[in-house]
Amino acid sequence: MRLSFFTALSAVASLGYALPGKLQSRDVSTSELDQFEFWVQYAAASYYEADYTAQVGDKLSCSKGNCPEVEATGATVSYDFSDSTITDTAGYIAVDHTNSAVVLAFRGSYSVRNWVADATFVHTNPGLCDGCLAELGFWSSWKLVRDDIIKELKEVVAQNPNYELVVVGHSLGAAVATLAATDLRGKGYPSAKLYAYASPRVGNAALAKYITAQGNNFRFTHTNDPVPKLPLLSMGYVHVSPEYWITSPNNATVSTSDIKVIDGDVSFDGNTGTGLPLLTDFEAHIWYFVQVDAGKGPGLPFKRV
């Protein structure tokens, strides 16, 4: 199905779903919060050209000061990728000896507002599971860099056999990270952890249920961020569960009580229930514990529609 965002937007208001998500009555723990705040800094680092075009052995750094904990680990780049495909997928593989982790990070888009304004959403069969359909652009972004990344991961993991694999991303990078983690779990990395901040929906209900069943998924939304509301439910797209919904305002420190844990692939208790996606709500999109995209260069000018 191929529909533009604005053509389909009005359809969502009339939707009804029989299987709403369940809002858990617990706060996250302090140790969980520490993990959430830490891994997003790897996503933040992926926006810096110096990191996604780094030389092997270079330390990750964030000149805008939004990844201090990552800098403190001394994590080094073992592989990076950028501008190598028509999808402009960018990111890096880093080794964090302090936390015994191999990190695969995907950069978000430099022009996400234009992506929202102009987006068309087409399903494709990724071959991950029976009945599973993924969004074509997100799947293509992963598929075009997959072989090289898997080759590099094999070498890095062989050198660090007891390290965990962590896949991270923000915004469109989170969508690619979600599909990458899903695919990698079936290719020798079954325990790969996913930290997806502000991810759009990546596929249909069958794919969402498949990814959810794999486990080790941490998907974050923030107040009324419009990007996780896309592609629309009316277009056949469903989220991975659970959702960690951050309710604190922009530019504010997040406490354990500010994060609500919501189970279910279709839920109106969290971000989805805050209304239709609006282009005026983008401040919520860039603040996930830190200003995640502070390191990005100039993107395309915002297109008024």
Swiss-Prot record:
Alphabetized UniProt keyword annotations: Disulfide bond, Glycoprotein, Hydrolase, Lipid degradation, Lipid metabolism, Metal-binding, Secreted, Signal, Zinc, Zymogen
Disulfide cysteine pairs (residue numbers): 62-67, 129-132
EC number: 3.1.1.-
Pfam families linked to this entry: Lipase3_N, Lipase_3
EC class name: hydrolase
Chain positions carrying an annotated carbohydrate: 251
InterPro entries for the chain: AB_hydrolase_fold, AB_hydrolase_lip/est, Fungal_lipase-type, Mono/diacylglycerol_lipase_N
Proregion positions: 303-305
Chief location bin: secreted
GO biological process: antibiotic biosynthetic process; lipid catabolic process; monocarboxylic acid biosynthetic process
PROSITE patterns xrefs: LIPASE_SER (PS00120)
Signal peptide span: 1-18
Known catalytic reactions: a monoacylglycerol + H2O = glycerol + a fatty acid + H(+); a diacylglycerol + H2O = a monoacylglycerol + a fatty acid + H(+)
Active site positions, chain numbering: 171, 225, 285
Annotated consequence of substituting residue 171 to A: Retains a fraction of activity
Subcellular location(s) of the protein: Secreted
Example of a GO cellular component annotation carried by this entry: extracellular region
Protein residues bound to Zn(2+): 263, 265
Regulation: The activity is inhibited by Hg(2+) and Fe(3+), but not significantly affected by EDTA or the other metal ions such as Na(+), K(+), Li(+), Mg(2+), Zn(2+), Ca(2+), Mn(2+), Cu(2+) and Fe(2+).
UniProt note: domains: Residue Phe-302, localized near active sites, is a bulky residue that modulates substrate specificity and especially act as steric hindrances for triacylglycerol binding.
Similarity remark: Belongs to the AB hydrolase superfamily. Lipase family. Class 3 subfamily.
Function: Secreted lipase strictly specific to mono- and diacylglycerol, but not triacylglycerol. Shows the highest activity on 1,2-dibutyrin substrate.
Protein name (database record): Secreted mono- and diacylglycerol lipase A
Organism: Penicillium cyclopium
Gene: mdlA
